C-alpha cells in the first residue's frame, strides 16, 4: 500500500478506544504511513489522560460529542437523560460537526479511521465526504449475524445495534474487534479481527504479587470497592479511575491505593496482580486475558453494551461477572484458576497482520 495520510476520530469515554487508536498509530507508522491529526470526542466531565498527549505524535483536537449521562453518584447510566442531553446539546454538536468539516478540509487526509465516535457517522450522513472512512471497534461484532446476544432485552438490543450502525454510517469497512474468530459475515463490510492491543503488552513478563488491580470507567464505583475493602483491610487494592471530580488521588489507607489513569503504570501493575476487577469494557479485559489474569467484570448499571461484554468475555474464558463489586468472588476464583489462554494469545498475536491486511484490501 502506498503511503497514506490518516486522520483519527476517537470516542474518548474510558481508555479502550484511545488505547486502540494508539496501537493503530504504531502499526501504521511502522508501515511508513502518516497520522496527521487525532480528534477525541468527549463530554465535559471527562479529561483526556496525560499519557494520550505523550503517545500520539501528531496534533490532538478535542470535540464535544454525545456521551452517556450518569446518575448523581457517577455510577449507572441514565438512558432517558442521555437522550434528552443529546437533544438539548444539538447546537453544540452541530458546532462540533462544523469543526470536523473544517479540519478535514484543512488536513485533507487520504483515510479517516473512526474509533466509535458517533459524530463521524452523523458527518457522513449530512456531508458528501469523499474521504474513505473505516471504523474500528468491538461493538461492530453486534452486526455479525452469528453473535449471541443475552436472552431478552430486545429494546436494548435494538438501540445498541442502531447506535452502532450510526457510528459506522458511510464506512467502506467496519473492523469488528473480537475475543475470538468467527465465520465471515454475510455483510461484506463487517470483518472480524483480533484485539488491537498496545505493543508494550507483548514485551512485559507476567508474575503474581499479593494485590488486586481495579479499573473503573465511572469513578463513582470507587465507594463500592472501598466498602468491600473496609471489610477486608488485609487485601491490597490498586485502583485506577478518571481523576476528574475525584476528591483524592493517592493512598486511601495502607492497603488501598488510588491512581489517575496512566497506561504504563496500569500495565505494569496488571502484569503483577492476582486478578483484575473492572467495569465490563473490552480493552482491559483483553490485556488481562493475554497476561493470563482472571477478571471480575461488573457492567455499569444501565449499560447494555457492558452487559453483553461481560457475558461474551465470560464465554471466551476471561473470568467471571457480577452485578456488583463483590471482590470476594474474584479472590476465591483466582485462588483456584488454572485457565490456559494460549489460543487467545495466538489470536491476539495475529492482530497486526490481520488488521493491516484488511486496511490494504480497501485502500490499495
PLM features: residue spans?
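Donor-nucleotide binding loops and adjacent catalytic segments primarily
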Residues: 196-272
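Conserved nucleotide-sugar donor-binding subdomain of glycosyltransferases
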Residues: 75-111, 118-119
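A short, glycine/small-residue-rich beta-strand->loop->alpha-helix junction that serves as a flexible
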Residues: 10-22
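Leloir-type glycosyltransferase catalytic cores
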Residues: 166-173, 180, 317-364
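Conserved nucleotide-sugar phosphate-binding/catalytic loop shared by glycosyltransferases and other
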Residues: 3-4, 12, 30-31, 35-88
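Glycosyltransferases and closely related glycan-assembly transferases
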Residues: 52, 101-111, 121-134
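Active-site-proximal region of nucleotide-activated glycan assembly enzymes
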Residues: 127, 131-192
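A donor-sugar binding/catalytic signature common to diverse glycosyltransferases
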Residues: 112-115, 268-308
Amino acid at each position: 500500500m502506498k503511503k497514506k495520510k490518516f486522520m483519527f476520530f476517537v470516542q474518548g469515554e474510558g481508555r479502550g478506544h484511545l488505547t486502540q487508536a494508539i496501537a493503530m498509530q504504531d502499526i501504521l507508522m511502522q508501515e511508513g504511513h502518516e497520522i496527521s491529526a487525532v480528534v477525541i470526542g468527549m463530554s465535559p466531565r471527562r479529561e483526556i489522560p496525560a499519557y494520550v498527549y505523550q503517545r500520539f505524535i501528531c496534533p490532538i483536537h478535542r470535540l464535544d460529542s454525545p456521551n452517556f449521562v450518569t446518575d448523581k453518584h457517577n455510577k449507572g447510566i441514565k438512558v432517558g437523560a442521555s437522550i434528552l442531553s443529546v437533544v438539548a446539546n444539538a447546537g453544540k454538536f452541530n458546532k462540533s460537526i462544523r469543526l470536523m468539516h473544517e479540519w478535514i478540509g484543512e488536513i485533507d487526509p487520504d483515510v479517516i479511521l473512526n474509533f466509535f465516535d458517533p459524530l463521524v457517522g452523523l458527518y457522513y450522513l449530512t456531508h458528501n465526504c469523499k474521504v474513505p472512512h473505516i471504523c474500528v471497534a468491538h461493538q461492530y461484532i453486534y452486526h455479525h449475524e452469528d453473535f449471541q446476544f443475552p436472552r431478552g432485552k430486545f429494546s436494548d438490543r435494538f438501540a445498541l445495534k442502531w447506535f452502532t450502525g450510526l457510528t459506522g454510517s458511510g464506512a467502506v469497512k467496519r473492523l469488528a474487534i473480537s475475543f475470538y474468530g468467527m465465520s465471515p459475515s454475510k455483510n461484506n463490510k463487517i470483518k472480524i479481527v483480533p484485539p488491537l492491543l498496545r505493543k508494550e503488552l507483548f514485551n512485559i513478563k507476567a508474575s503474581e504479587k499479593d494485590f488486586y488491580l481495579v479499573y473503573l470507567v465511572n469513578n463513582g464505583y470507587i465507594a463500592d470497592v472501598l466498602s468491600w475493602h473496609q471489610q477486608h483491610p488485609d487485601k491490597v487494592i490498586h485502583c485506577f479511575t478518571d481523576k476528574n471530580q475525584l476528591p483524592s488521588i493517592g493512598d486511601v489507607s495502607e492497603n488501598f491505593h488510588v491512581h489517575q489513569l496512566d497506561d504504563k503504570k496500569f500495565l505494569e501493575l496488571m502484569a503483577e496482580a492476582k486478578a483484575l476487577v473492572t467495569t465490563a469494557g473490552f480493552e482491559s479485559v483483553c490485556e488481562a486475558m493475554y497476561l493470563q489474569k482472571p477478571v471480575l467484570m461488573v457492567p455499569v448499571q444501565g449499560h447494555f453494551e457492558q452487559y453483553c461484554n461481560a457475558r461474551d468475555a465470560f464465554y471466551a474464558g476471561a473470568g467471571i461477572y457480577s452485578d456488583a463489586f463483590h471482590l470476594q468472588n474474584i479472590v476465591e476464583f483466582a485462588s483456584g484458576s488454572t485457565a490456559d489462554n494460549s489460543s487467545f494469545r495466538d489470536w491476539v498475536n495475529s492482530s497486526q497482520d490481520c488488521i493491516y491486511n484488511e486496511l490494504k484490501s480497501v485502500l490499495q
